[in-house]
Amino acid sequence: MELIDVLESTYTCRYYKEDEVEEEKLKRVLSAARWGPSGGNRQPVSLIVVRDKDKKSALQDLYLPLWEPYVRGIEQGDIKISARNSRMLQAADHFARNLANVPVLIQICARLEDVHPTDIELDRLSIVGGASVYPAVQNILLSARNEGLGSALTTLLCTVEYDVKKLLEIPDDVSTAAMLTLGYPVNKFPSKLNRKPIEDMCWNETFGRNFF
């Protein structure tokens, strides 16, 4: 595939076939993570591939209690969503309740001593540390699309990091950063994703000054 076609059609896949992902294809997808940049080339990212049914079920059991309060809030009218988001909610709910049936789960980990954010002294949430982690994650997502595989990124399980670390025997000095799902999609890939135009996000010299 052309790179631009991969970029424009890598979507969040929430419906998966139960077909296994071939070993060689999986290896190529995972290997793409190695080429993500990191500060000082410290390469803090590590991956745990989970295909064992019991472990996937245990991860689903951790995921659902975090997800269900959001659904209840919508059902009770406490959280308002649009009709479009209502369709997305249905897909996300299916995803949450079928996590154990996804062929491959990939736990993304990072060794924090190799992540050196430069914004921790600012009076806001630190975001810079992710620059050494999430490029590797994006590489996996794009590589999966190139191989005809669907994928999704979720960070919800980071809320229960202790339990995830215990289940997957993650060392004390390694933290959880995300979990990816991987498999053959039930639905066709979109030809192009719905994104805001470049004119709404790219500025000339100063913020808000039109570039285009």
Q: What would you call each of these model-derived segments?
A:
Residues 5-6, 12-13, 176-212:
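C-terminal helix-cap and adjacent tail motif
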Residues 52-57, 65, 112-113, 162, ...:
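Short, charged/polar surface micro-motifs in flexible loops or helix N-caps
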